Amino acid sequence: MPVSILVLYDRKNSAIESLARAAASGVELSGADVTLKRTTEAITADLLAADGLLLGSPNWSGITGSLKSWLDDQGDLWEDGSLAGKPAAAFTSGSGQHSGLEMTLLQMIHWMLACGMVVVGLPWGERMRVAGSYYGATAVGDMTTEDMAQARELGARLASIATKLTRT
């Protein structure tokens, strides 16, 4: 049975949605099942049912308030350890290269670590000269083919690690 990955993101009709769809295609290409949901559609059961999580937010001086609220609502999962051991990765978009993209990724990663999740990033590659970060997938301004490629790579990498973790 293939692993299932939840791609959860905040905001509709933005670069973040394009990154979410690209990451989801990477999950699918790896043979895993994927569920793509905005925070307005997702419930706790979606998170619990998934073998891994890809979490995304546009950079608004950090994650959006609505994503922060959604994550705060999952406090019981932090307390009971329900997410411990699940792999997770992050993605973000912003208007400028130095607008705080890595801080936004780190905010999401902080929540993942607090929940005991296994954080998955992107290893160095030539593509990283123009797109992405060790901390996760990124897009700056208009979406590029490199942005889409590194989001797909992150999705496939997360699915691969989720498969390895669920088979051990």
What do the PLM-derived regions correspond to, one by one?
Residues P58, T64-G65, P87, F91-S95:
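Short strand-turn motif at the edge of the Rossmann-like AdoMet-binding core
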Residues V3, A84-P87, V120:
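Residue-level recognition of the N-termini of beta-strands and the immediately preceding loop/turn
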Residues M1-S82, M128-V130, Y135, A139-T168:
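N-terminal beta1-alpha1-beta2 submodule of the flavodoxin-like/Rossmannoid cofactor-binding fold
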Residues V7, I16, K86-A90, M112:
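Long hydrophobic alpha-helices with heptad-repeat/coiled-coil character
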Residues D33, A84, M103-L106:
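Intrinsically disordered, low-complexity regions
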Residues A89-V130:
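Short, glycine-/small-residue-rich phosphate/pyrophosphate-handling segment
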